Amino acid sequence: MAVLALLFCLVTFPSCILSQVQLKESGPGLVAPSQSLSITCTVSGFSLTGYGVNWVRQPPGKGLEWLGMIWGDGSTDYNSALKSRLSISKDNSKSQVFLKMNSLQTDDTARYYCA
């Protein structure tokens, strides 16, 4: 019976469960080629010490491309094709994750997301 009650809650009120976690990106709208891009992701609803955060991007008319991630312990993994130009860091006390990308090229034109 408890399982049915839980299932009813999940089906009827999914927003009350999923709306707790939020990630919001902030940064410049446009950056010129050869310049650097810096984006901040502010999270709420979970602790950065216990969970990792990924960065992805989506060029116009294309699919998502994984850039890299930072784990709860602060270690990082990067897309090998972009590793030399990327840096991901975080400030646990401010619940913020930072993406920095250097030497931008026209191929870097995309929407950038944290997830």
Swiss-Prot record:
GO terms for molecular function: antigen binding. Keywords: Adaptive immunity, Immunity, Immunoglobulin, Signal. Residues 1-19 form the signal peptide. It holds the Pfam family V-set. The keyword Ribonucleoprotein does not apply. GO terms for biological process: immunoglobulin mediated immune response. It comes from the Eukaryota. Gene3D superfamilies: Immunoglobulins. GO terms for cellular component: extracellular region; immunoglobulin complex. Residues 20-115 form the Ig-like domain. This is Ig heavy chain V region PJ14. It comes from Mus musculus (Mouse).
